[in-house]
Amino acid sequence: MKLSLVVLTLISVAAQALALVARENLPKPQNDPFYQPPDGWESKKVGTILRSRKVNINTLVKDNLKEAWQLLYRTTYRSDDEPTTTVTTIMVPHNAQNDSLVMFGDFEDAGAPQCAPSYTWRAGLTSDVSSIFNVGIAMLYLQEGYIVTMPDKEGNKGAFGSGHVEGRQSLDGIRATLAFDKIGLNKNARVVGHGYSGGGIQCGWTAALKKSYAPEINSVGWYTGGTPSNLTALVERINGGPFAGYVAGGLGGVISTYPDVKAYTDKVFTKQAQKDLEFPQKHCQFEVVLRFPFKNFYDKSFSTVGKRFLYEPVVQKALNELTMGTNPEFTPDTPVLMAHGISDEIAPYEAAHKTYESWCKNGADVEFLSFVNPVSAHGVTTVTSSVPGFLWNRDRLQGKPVQNGCREIKNHDAGINSNALGEDFESALGLLKGLLGDKIGPNDEYLKDALHK
């Protein structure tokens, strides 16, 4: 059946209400001792586990997983000589498959510590309501019995949009998860990744960097949807529009990880600009979007050189480095499914397609799924692409072959085809079994019996 956006909205509203009930009074990451590494951590190898703890996942579902863990691990920023630490959250469903691992890219899209999934997925619905949609997608994998790991890929600098940082920290999160001996996961488990929007940046760069940074990981597929693969094109698309707040978040992430860009912007950005860029480092994405609707970041009140700051050589050098497909060295060596709506009003379709073309030219195996219905905007495609992305990754985890080379596919749907998921997902309720008190994982008959009565 086709689930309308109205039904999806009702599901989301109900989930939000339950998440409010589930909220715990948790210390924010900057006040939580778990996030502070022990002495000597800098000398450890990347991916080394420094701390671990059991946690409850309280966004959407509470206590219905078999277990959940968090790992503090050693990682880096853009280069090997920039050591840092971050956290990944591991969710283990009942009847979990121990030969498969899903790296899930949460689209937190802001730099504040309390926006990271290691906090929002424990605290319930706080200021970051995007966690509701992230959980809905992750539930597809959990219900199928896949262990899910979700790295805080922006690290301590809130590096939203800084792809090399996100990719490295995600790969090290996978390393840490595979090395963790308390969840029964095979050390050579098949690995896939799923990410949309900001999660698409994460997953796209994880795929691109894996060959050079973590070649030992047994990755078999990556899904990246609605991907802002070119940050220059992203800024040009959303500046002055309703989603202009993402400009502030993205600029802050790049500035925090490129010292030469910071040195330049410190000279040309106004005091007001500095205040504007601080906001996404303290607030989550919906607050950021609501703070800056229709703001023109090219205005002289923000930049003394107007729009020229974006095209200053030192800025363009960084943004070119952060454009997927520009460097042949960073070409995925594992099959990729890209999905994008032709009417995407945030992440330009043309830029994502150019990344597809570049990766294909450099020898990658990529499928590009275009949602060609005129209503296929960024938010709509978050929903419509979730099932194809899940099914494609499931095929990879099950060892089904993928067509070599590249191909393009067109999808005319404007809704989500839940029939494609099989009988366990005959209803929207099938995605929300955890909400009804049932255990999360395969082979649970409670809801299915209830639906067939």
Curated annotation (Swiss-Prot):
Instruction: Name its GO BP terms in alphabetical order.
Output: lipid catabolic process
Kindly list the cysteine pairs connected by disulfide bridges. 115-284, 360-406
Question: Where does the UniProt entry place glycosylation sites?
Answer: 98, 230
What GO terms are given for molecular function? Answer: triacylglycerol lipase activity
Recount how this protein's activity depends on pH.
Answer: Optimum pH is 5.0.
Which UniProt keywords are listed?
Answer: Disulfide bond, Glycoprotein, Hydrolase, Lipid degradation, Lipid metabolism, Secreted, Signal, Virulence
Which Gene Ontology CC terms are recorded?
extracellular region
Name the Enzyme Commission number(s) assigned to this protein.
3.1.1.-, 3.1.1.3
Reaction(s) catalysed (UniProt annotation): a triacylglycerol + H2O = a diacylglycerol + a fatty acid + H(+); a monoacylglycerol + H2O = glycerol + a fatty acid + H(+); a diacylglycerol + H2O = a monoacylglycerol + a fatty acid + H(+)
The reply to whether Nucleotide-binding figures as a keyword in the UniProt entry is: no
* Activation and inhibition: The activity is significantly increased in the presence of Triton X-100 and partially inhibited by PMSF but unaffected by univalent and divalent metal ions. Activity is significantly decreased in acetate buffer compared to that in citrate buffer at the same pH.
Q: What does this protein do?
A: Major secreted lipase involved in Dandruff and seborrheic dermatitis (D/SD) probably via lipase-mediated breakdown of sebaceous lipids and release of irritating free fatty acids. Has triacylglycerol lipase activity and is able to hydrolyze triolein, tristearin, trilinolein, tripalmitoylglycerol and trihexadecenoin. Hydrolyze diacylglycerols such as distearin, dilinolein, dipalmitoylglycerol and dipalmitolein. Shows high esterase activity against 4-nitrophenyl palmitate and 1-naphthyl palmitate but not 1-naphthyl acetate, suggesting that it specifically recognizes fatty acids.
Similarity field = Belongs to the AB hydrolase superfamily. Lipase family. Class Lip subfamily.
Q: What is this protein called?
A: Secreted triacylglycerol lipase LIP2
What is the originating organism of this protein?
Answer: Malassezia globosa (strain ATCC MYA-4612 / CBS 7966)
Q: Gene encoding this polypeptide?
A: LIP2
